[in-house]
Amino acid sequence: MRTKAVLLLATAIWMHVFAADATDVERIRLQSRDAVLEVTPALGGRVLAFGLAGHPSLINIGDPVASQPNPAVSATADDIGYLGHDVWLGPQSGWWSDQQVNAARHDARAVWPPDPYLAFAQTRVVARAPDRLVLEGIDSPVTGVRLLKSFAFDPADPATLELSALARNIRDRPVSRDLWFNTRTSAAIRVYVPVATDADVRIEAAEAMAPAWRSDAGVFAFLPPSTAGASRRGKVLMQPSAGWMAGFAHRQAFVIRFDLQPRSAIHPQQGQVELYLDHGEDIAAGLLEMEVHAPYRTLAPGEAMRASERWTVLAYDGADTPQAHLAFLCRRLQLCAVSTAD
């Protein structure tokens, strides 16, 4: 599901503290009273850093951000492990089956790499302020859309950032897609997702590599590997019971909120929340993707669809246990109870 270009995990920059390399891509910094965001208009308009001011970034990026800042944009391009946060179009099974610019990938119904026009192209800065940024991408002949991405701190809550993506159909015929947010973090982050039952969780992984997990009191969480040095690689697809997920790392609580959707609105091959986990013996050098799918829709020519996430980051100085983490979420953000979407 991921190529070796993505799996540059040992060299992924987990402890990045909002400092650019001389050969790095351009970075635009947005800042509120509490938090800092860094976005590059290169690489499709990608988030490179987010966290509390003066703290390590919660976003994982790869060495190619500095070593390959100007990738070629073409229908034959392969994936490059920039990581960060970006936006894909789902479902994955349709990435190359509805295009005419790469026959080999079309005929193979390829599910990798992601659309290079969305992932690699330079975007245009449409609006910019100290706490707000809007970027417009280019027309993609692969997915048939153009993306408009917006980032803005909430003036009423300086710990919260709203991210939105608008996809417009640029073709002269309908296209069927969903908007898919993908936020890369370290595999060492302690992540939680509310689920009503275990039946709302499915695993895609080889049995020997499948991540261990449990749901307790309506919340999904990964379990530590049962043996030292164990490697894990796989995807968890979930129908959440509430519109949030959260992670804890580096004395920060990172909460992603979104509009909860009924199962029927999400493409059946996907989950509204997906977690992709990949790590070897050094878990902190591994990768966790925190992913959210918006409803699957058919767009008429020229029609657009929009989806958004709200990111909140708070200082956390409690114990590194699930009980303490969940108590903090309930106390500080009222993320306590779960409900069924269907």
Region locations from a protein language model:
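Positively charged n-region of N-terminal signal peptides that target proteins for export
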Residues: 1-5
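Bacterial N-terminal signal peptides
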Residues: 6-16
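Surface-exposed acidic/polar loop and edge beta-strand patches at domain peripheries
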Residues: 20-162, 166, 170-342
